[in-house]
Amino acid sequence: PNLDRIQIIKGWLDKDGKSQERIFDVAVSDGRKIGPDGRCKTPVGSTVDVANASYTNTIGAPALSAYWRDPTFDATKGAFYYVRVIQIPSPRWTAYDQKRFGIKMPDYVPMTVTDRAYTSPIWYSPN
């Protein structure tokens, strides 16, 4: 499937020693905009046809790239960063089973999935 967005997740310890995280959208598909808070509020949408357990790559992007600089960086504080890449929605295995076996899944069963890929973290230490 095509890509919806690329995110950078920053983690750090606050003054009380509690872990914190912040998500930054760094690249988004389909001409959507990233707001001043570092997030894109517009969803990519979905082309999933649950009845046929299919989708089309008519939304999203085949590739995304970006240059990003942490707007909250403080050289005196440790942090970690990792990248998360999110695909457009596609049929979940339950949709394929429903079609193949001619059954009806209960309404509470998810029929789509949005797959994600994660990188290993990069650790910053002020020492």
Regions found by a protein language model. Give the residues of each.
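C-terminal functional module detector
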Residues: 1-127
